[in-house]
């Protein structure tokens, strides 16, 4: 990877993101059992496989017609599991919280 700093291009799903994943994360954090590069990975737990995935979303505005970033995150993540043939039972949390976000806005997005 030629870049010396992370840019927005590294998060857009294209070539720069692939280079970042392959040359930084996969190279240094490789795990052959998890290295399937799919939306959901099978993990053997106590003799039974589960499918695990986590996803991250950013969108502006945080609330939009028909939903908000919270509903987008839940539906996007459970969709990754469903298309892999799993029945979603649990969710992991991957939160990108911008500096200056009002706590009330955060609470409204997670429905507390």
Which functions belong to the PLM regions below?
Residues 110-112:
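Conserved small/polar residues in nucleotide/adenosyl-binding loops
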Residues 81-92:
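Short, flexible active-site-proximal loops enriched in glycine and acidic residues
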Residues 55-58, 94-102:
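Acidic, glycine-rich active-site loops and adjacent beta-strand->loop/helix elements
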Residues 1-83:
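N-terminal glycine-rich phosphate/pyrophosphate-binding loops that anchor nucleotide-derived ligands
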Residues 77, 107-108:
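Alpha-helix boundary/capping detector
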């Amino acid at each position: 990877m030629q870049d010396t700093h992370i840019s927005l291009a590294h998060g857009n799903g294209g070539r720069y993101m692939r280079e970042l994943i392959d040359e930084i994360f996969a190279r240094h954090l490789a795990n052959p059992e998890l290295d399937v590069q799919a939306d959901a990975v099978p993990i053997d737990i106590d003799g039974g496989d589960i499918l695990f995935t986590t996803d991250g979303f950013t969108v502006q505005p945080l609330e939009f017609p028909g939903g908000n970033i919270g509903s987008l995150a839940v539906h996007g993540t459970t969709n990754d599991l469903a298309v892999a043939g799993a029945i979603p039972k649990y969710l992991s949390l991957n939160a990108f919280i911008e500096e200056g976000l009002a706590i009330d806005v955060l609470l409204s997005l997670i429905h507390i």
